[in-house]
């Protein structure tokens, strides 16, 4: 599983997405970060693949989209995921293409991945059940989740410093964007 945003944050990248793909190596693109904006992940994966290989061939948004959907399903051994067809789980999203920042719409997939973000997702259906509509998840308090997330993040940072094999201080592991006094 390739997580381009996370790997890229520390200067890493996948050697050659097109080469793996052309060699029939399954590449599944995922994310293990918050916020998990998959459109950003797809955009970054596509850019890295094109930069590393020096060509746009084999790293189109369709290629990356297939790595996200079909590649992930194959990695999990789940032929009922990653596609819309008879016998598959009805997992889908609806994206608002009318917002100004989307610009002119030519190819919907390309437009979404070039200009969109997770904030443009208006509907999410998982296994045929609507779980999010109009950006609202029934019974979920996002402010409460955000506050708990900050608490867990702070604990994670402390634990990370304890486990760091170099025993670097927090200011080295979690450098601020600008010096703070």
Question: Language model features by range: what are they?
Answer:
Residues 9-14, 38-40, 104:
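Short, charged, surface-exposed secondary-structure boundary motifs
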Residues 16-99, 114-118:
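His/Asp/Glu-enriched, well-ordered alpha-helical/loop segment
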Residues 1, 28, 125:
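Conserved beta-strand segments that form the floor/walls of ligand-binding pockets within enzyme
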Residues 8-11, 75-77:
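Active-site glycine- and acidic-residue-rich loops that bind
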């Amino acid at each position: 599983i390739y997580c381009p945003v996370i790997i890229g944050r520390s200067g890493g990248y996948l050697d050659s997405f097109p080469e793996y793909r052309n060699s029939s190596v399954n590449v599944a693109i995922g994310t293990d970060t918050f916020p998990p904006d998959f459109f950003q992940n797809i955009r970054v994966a596509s850019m890295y693949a094109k930069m590393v290989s020096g060509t746009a061939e084999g790293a189109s948004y369709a290629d990356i989209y297939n790595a996200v959907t079909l590649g992930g399903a194959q990695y999990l051994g789940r032929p009922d995921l990653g596609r819309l067809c008879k016998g598959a789980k009805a997992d889908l999203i609806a994206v608002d293409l009318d917002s100004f920042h989307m610009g002119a719409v030519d190819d919907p997939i390309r437009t979404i991945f070039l200009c969109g973000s997770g904030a443009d997702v208006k509907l999410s259906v998982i296994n045929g059940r609507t779980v999010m509509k109009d950006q609202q998840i029934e019974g979920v308090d996002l402010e409460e989740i955000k506050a708990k997330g900050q608490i867990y993040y702070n604990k994670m940072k402390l634990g990370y410093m304890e486990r760091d094999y170099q025993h670097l201080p927090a200011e080295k592991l979690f450098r601020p964007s600008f010096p703070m006094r």
